[in-house]
Structure formats: structure tokens, C-alpha cells
From Swiss-Prot:
This is NADH-quinone oxidoreductase subunit 10. It is an enzyme of class 7 (translocase). NDH-1 is composed of 15 different subunits, Nqo1 to Nqo15. The complex has a L-shaped structure, with the hydrophobic arm (subunits Nqo7, Nqo8 and Nqo10 to Nqo14) embedded in the membrane and the hydrophilic peripheral arm (subunits Nqo1 to Nqo6, Nqo9 and Nqo15) protruding into the bacterial cytoplasm. The hydrophilic domain contains all the redox centers. The chain crosses the membrane at residues 2-22, 26-46, 56-76, 91-111, 137-157. It is a multi-pass membrane protein. PANTHER family: NADH-UBIQUINONE OXIDOREDUCTASE CHAIN 6 (PTHR33269:SF17). The gene is nqo10.
Length: 176
């Protein structure tokens, strides 16, 4: 392992640990951006320039902006209702995370995950049939998980707004 590979590995592991352990969500999102940028550098070093650019544009750009948007929604809800709306759901979230990790471990157990196909530098012509062929389920599962996480975050914020709007309407009717 060369010095640059070791540095990239260290930065990937460090930023990954920071994403999970930092208490400030904005700092965790910044650590996630660092992780994505280092991973993009690894892709470029492996001569997969297209994947590196997509990593920066899609993940470090769009996905992190989406995460920050959801984080801001949750912080807005926390300020409006006076408490953290996620406190009661943390044990359930931990249980679900352990369940998903168990399912993933059971599914990956005994699989030969050696990737032997030549991706021709990460060109879209080589990636397209692979993503929409052999790895279609994985691609759809990742998309579904991202969508579900966003919907749940918005759903945590919306009930408070809807009930306040109904209360305001009732007050107006009573005042008439």
C-alpha cells in the first residue's frame, strides 16, 4: 500500500466515523462531504474519472444538499415544538438499524463479491448495462431508502404544522 492509498484510507475511515459520531448535524454533513470527496479522488486514482465526477456532482452536491434540507426541517420542528421530535423514535431506529444490518449480513454471507468486470474507466457505456442488469435491485433499494428517509423526515415535521393551521382556523371561526 502506497502512502497516498494509506492517506485516502485513513481519511475515509476518519470522516466516516465523524459522520456517525458528531453531535452537530451540520458538522456531520461536512464530514460526509469530505468522505465523498476523498472517495471521488480514489475513483479518479483508479482511472474511473466518470465515477469520480459523478461522485462529486451527485453525492457531494445533490445528496448532501438534500440531507442538509432535511436536517434544517428537523431543527425547525425542534424549535417550534420545544423538544426533539426524534427522542421517542431513537430506540426503534436503533432496533431497525440492527435488523437491517442483520439482514444485510445474512444476505452477504457466503457470496462471492469479487468484482471482475472491466468497467473501461467508469464510462457510462460500461456502467449502464451493469447497473440496470446485475445490480438493478441494489440500485432500486438505495433509491427507495433515500426516498423513504426523506418522506419520514418530512412527515416528522408536517403533523405539527397541520395541527397549528387547523387550530388557527378554529380560532378564526370562533372569533366570528
Amino acid at each position: 500500500m502506497s502512502l497516498l492509498e494509506g492517506l485516502a484510507l485513513f481519511l475515509l475511515l476518519l470522516s466516516g466515523v465523524l459522520v456517525v459520531t458528531l453531535r452537530n448535524a451540520i458538522h456531520a454533513a461536512l464530514a460526509l462531504i469530505l468522505n465523498f470527496l476523498v472517495l471521488a479522488g480514489v475513483y479518479v486514482a483508479l482511472d474511473a474519472r466518470f465515477l469520480g465526477f459523478i461522485q462529486v456532482i451527485v453525492y457531494a452536491g445533490a445528496i448532501v444538499v438534500l440531507f442538509l434540507f432535511v436536517i434544517m426541517l428537523l431543527f425547525a420542528a425542534q424549535g417550534e415544538i420545544g423538544f426533539d421530535p426524534l427522542v421517542r423514535s431513537r430506540p426503534l431506529a436503533a432496533l431497525l438499524a440492527l435488523g437491517v444490518a442483520g439482514i444485510l449480513a445474512a444476505g452477504l454471507w457466503g457470496l462471492d463479491l469479487a468484482f471482475t468486470q472491466d468497467l473501461k474507466g467508469g464510462l457510462p457505456q460500461a456502467l449502464g448495462p451493469l447497473l440496470y442488469g446485475d445490480w438493478l435491485f441494489v440500485l432500486l433499494a438505495v433509491g427507495f431508502l433515500l426516498m423513504a428517509a426523506t418522506v419520514v423526515a418530512v412527515a416528522l415535521v408536517e403533523p405539527g404544522k397541520a395541527s397549528r393551521a387547523k387550530e388557527a382556523e378554529k380560532r378564526e371561526e370562533v372569533a366570528r
